[in-house]
Amino acid sequence: MPKPAIKTAAKLAMSSAGKRGKPSTPKSLAKPQTTKPKTASKLKAKHGEQKRLHPRNLHINGYDFPALMASFPKLKAFVRPTPYGALSIDFADPFAVKNLNAALLKHHYGLAFWDIPKGALCPPIPGRVDYLHYLADLLFEGAKVKRAAAIHALDIGTGANGVYAILGHQVYDWQFVASDINPQSLINVQRIIDNNPSLQGHLSLRRQQDDKAVFKGIIQASDRFELTLCNPPFHGSLKEASEGSLRKVRNLQLNRGEQPKATSATLNFGGQAAELWCQGGEKQFLATMIRESQAFAEQCLWFTSLVSKQENLKPCYQALEKLGVDTVKTIEMQQGNKVTRVLAWSFHSQAKRLQWRNQVISGA
């Protein structure tokens, strides 16, 4: 059985972001430069690029708080000047982060309404949309990236926030199926859809009934997806997830010179079980996803997932080699001091991928 071509895409050299304005179409869809050596080793970005986002990311130059507050006045209550004279929020305060997200989604991506229940995971928008920009590059494989309503994507574990499906449609016009094991999460995402006409008819929701399955029970016989995406549960237990969240809050407080303390808001993990942890953690979740992907090889062009722990890549490569996949790529992303990777694999040759994509986009 031939070995898959394992490729690692280096972090891309970044250009300045486009002007802030109506968000439906990214300001720049220029083709980025990539390096693809035939090894699985991680490539280091050049000095000075370590904290950069994707060139098409609207948040590459940080947050424009005056513009965000003008678009979403509720944010004003959480914005404070820093000792350096800039404006910011307390990122250890979940209510501040939630309002920042709502402001970003309204100002840059045209969402009239976005909200999450108390205790639900509140993701950073710049990092989430970065994943989508890299997926667009992956899909177009060096060709000019463009919006395409014919592209169908599957978001595994969408959570109560639904941001991958929301951003994927608003930025690239992709059509989404979003799945989750928690019915309350899906109810909240449906509420977001119902309050945003631009999302209606473009996002459909499916509940995963089996807590040990990923694609099984979600992908139907008539489905064809150009992309699947996922942010797997990171931790292996609720205790581990709670400790990780508290550690993050304490680090934020220490960075501001404050005495570390836990609040009731930061200790509320009730709605986050499926979002933050599962039995076996990220490693087991990825193993299940890879194993199940073989059964849906003819229905999905690219399978992808975030991988937070670098040590989990090696067993993934080994499992993919055993399945005989055609291509494996690893794309490194970095936001601030956090490094994560996109693992992508396809059972189809490059020629077949090109034919598939072109037929979908042309409507053939």
UniProtKB/Swiss-Prot annotation:
Keywords of this entry: Cytoplasm, Methyltransferase, rRNA processing, S-adenosyl-L-methionine, Transferase
Coiled coil regions, renumbered to chain: none
Any one GO CC term of the record: cytoplasm
Subcellular location: Cytoplasm
Region (Disordered): 1-52
Family stated for the protein in its record: Belongs to the methyltransferase superfamily. METTL16/RlmF family.
Protein name: Ribosomal RNA large subunit methyltransferase F
Organism: Shewanella sp. (strain ANA-3)
